[in-house]
Amino acid sequence: AQDYHIKSWATVLTRLTSFRASVSILGGSPVTKETDLLSPDKIVENIDGIVLAGGSAFGLDASSGVMDCLRDQNRGFDTGAIKVPIVPSAILFDLKNGGFKEWSINPYRELGQNAFLKVSHDFEIGSVGAGCGATTSIVKGGLGTSSLFYGDRIKVGAIVAVNSVGSPCFPGTNFLFSDLYGEKN
């Protein structure tokens, strides 16, 4: 889900049942929630969703919106008293992208809920969802995915939201480093 007025977004990954996940956190100032639970030595083996969002620390509220939706479905880690939806989140900085940021109520909880309600097997990549407000120096950042299948039972997928520092171009040119490695689109 994206909000073009604030130029920010949220992307949600979930399944009908809990699933295993891992994470790689990069960058000089990561904003995350519950990503430590993805280490193999933790008691929680499965999660209920993943959130990628903009908004710097404000964006952490997107996972609260997703947790609300999952709780409505009676999903989560069973503590014996209540089920707690496990929703690791990674957030990008997009507060300087020109969008409206003078809101009085944090919009990210609603963005998270909207993204959860729009979950489907097919989704867009690029400057949508987690890529809506992302930038990479002088060009747009975005959302990308990859997946592998091993037989009928094992499926491995990766999703990344790119909002990096530095230039994606050869110094003094408009030629992208990636031009050396892929097709031109």
Where are these regions (language model features)?
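Alpha/propeptide regions of enzymes that mature by internal proteolysis
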Residues: 1-185
